[in-house]
């Protein structure tokens, strides 16, 4: 597995700004060419420069997998059209929900999704259909309802909040169909998503992520 440390706009919270699946990586405009080349090389995807809700916080607003991409209702028409036209083999839908931080509230791979407990039945149905997952479940991770913020799951493995119990880990492994471990990023942060961007081909970690954290991440994501 390719793994590289990265900073974006002077911060190690790279997952706030970047969304990836195995086909596309959506990045904010304004990154230098070297950073863009590194991202594309490590993740092995096509890069798209975009905004959501006139913001560069793409990792916060976007959730998805290889089948589909979900955008918040605050997405502006031209932003939606751009992604719809360029994400050619992904379904792209707007989730009409009061919840807009979809990256923080939906945790998914190609098999399953764990979602924010307060999504309603209609929202759950749209999420399931758009992502094309077999299983979907509302729940928490380590008592955190923002499940997307405290985990990263690929089709090869996953890393979640360090306080996740053994029972929870087993339930998550059954749901997603992969081995999952606990850990931290960026020198002790439990908000895994903020410091980790990964797909089945590669991994980017925040620049302050330590050697021991990286070893744990590599093991968890199936290297």
Curated annotation (Swiss-Prot):
GO biological process: assembly of large subunit precursor of preribosome; cytosolic ribosome assembly; maturation of 5.8S rRNA; maturation of LSU-rRNA
Keywords noted in UniProt: Initiation factor, Protein biosynthesis, RNA-binding, rRNA-binding, Stress response
PTM characteristics: Modified in an unknown fashion (not phosphorylation) following release from 50S ribosomal subunits.
Induction of its expression: Constitutively expressed, further induced by cold (60) or heat (90 degrees Celsius) shock (at protein level).
Function: Binds to the 50S ribosomal subunit and prevents its association with the 30S ribosomal subunit to form the 70S initiation complex. Inhibits translation of both leadered and leaderless mRNAs, maybe by binding to the 50S ribosome subunit, preventing it from binding to the 30S subunit.
HAMAP family: eIF_6
Protein family membership: Belongs to the eIF-6 family.
Protein name as annotated: Translation initiation factor 6
Lineage of the species this protein comes from: Archaea, Thermoproteota, Thermoprotei, Sulfolobales, Sulfolobaceae
């Amino acid at each position: 597995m390719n793994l590289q440390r990265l900073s974006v706009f002077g911060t190690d919270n790279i997952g706030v700004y970047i969304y990836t699946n195995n086909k596309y990586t959506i990045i904010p405009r304004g990154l230098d060419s070297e950073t863009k080349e590194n991202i594309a090389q490590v993740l092995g995807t096509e890069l798209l420069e975009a905004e959501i809700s006139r913001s560069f916080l793409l990792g916060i607003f976007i959730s998805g997998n290889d089948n589909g991409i979900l955008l918040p209702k605050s997405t502006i028409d031209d932003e939606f059209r751009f992604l719809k036209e360029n994400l050619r083999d992904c379904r792209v839908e707007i989730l009409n929900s009061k919840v807009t931080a979809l990256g923080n509230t939906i945790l998914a791979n190609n098999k399953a999704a764990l979602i924010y407990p307060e999504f309603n039945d209609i929202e759950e149905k749209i999420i399931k259909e758009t992502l094309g997952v077999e299983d979907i479940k509302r729940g928490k991770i380590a008592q955190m309802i923002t499940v997307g913020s405290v985990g990263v799951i690929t089709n090869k493995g996953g890393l979640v909040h360090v306080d996740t119990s053994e029972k929870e880990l087993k339930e998550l492994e059954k749901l997603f169909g992969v081995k999952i471990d606990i850990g931290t990023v960026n020198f002790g942060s439990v908000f895994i998503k903020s410091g980790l961007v990964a797909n089945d081909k590669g991994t980017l970690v925040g620049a302050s992520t330590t050697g021991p954290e990286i070893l744990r991440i590599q093991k968890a994501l199936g290297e």
